[in-house]
Amino acid sequence: GFTSPAPRDYVGSKPLVAPEAIAIYNFTRLHNFRLILAYHTQGKEIYWQFQNYATQEAEQIGEIFAQVSGYALSEVPYNSSFAGYKDWFLQEYRRPGYTIEAGLGENPLPISQFNDIYNDNIGILVLGAVL
């Protein structure tokens, strides 16, 4: 899935080609977000850094998110960087941004994980609105 459209891992032929990427880009430009959360599934991890653009505050907030969710606060694997919403937001705005890898297992995750994912992430969603 790295070189052609697929259910996962394909980042596109260039930035801002996919309609959903354009929509998120435009929506972000219209708002003055203090922080952003980008949700993916697979891993029970929180990625917070991108090429040293993240601030110390971003790590501190990430630690709070990790504590309330039980997810690990992690560095993004190098081969997974450079194409995500969080990466762009950190570079463009120098504000906290996070990719939340919800759930555990291989995509697509089973619907049976829904309640666990919800319970793990409700604290992140509430705190993300007020921190």
Listing of model-derived features with the role each one plays in the protein:
Residues 1-55, 63, 99-109:
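Active-site/substrate-binding loop(s) of hydrolase catalytic cores
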Residues 77-97:
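Short glycine-rich, acidic/polar surface loops and turns
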Residues 109-131:
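His/Asp/Glu-rich mid-to-C-terminal helical/loop segments that flank catalytic regions of hydrolases
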Residues 64-77:
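Short, flexible loop segments at boundaries between secondary-structure elements
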Residues 29-33, 70, 126-130:
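Sec-exported extracytoplasmic/periplasmic mature domains
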Residues 19, 23-26, 56-64, 80, ...:
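Extracytoplasmic/secreted proteins, especially bacterial periplasmic and envelope-associated proteins
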Residues 43-44, 71, 81-87, 104-107:
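Short Gly/Pro-enriched loop/turn and capping motifs at secondary-structure junctions
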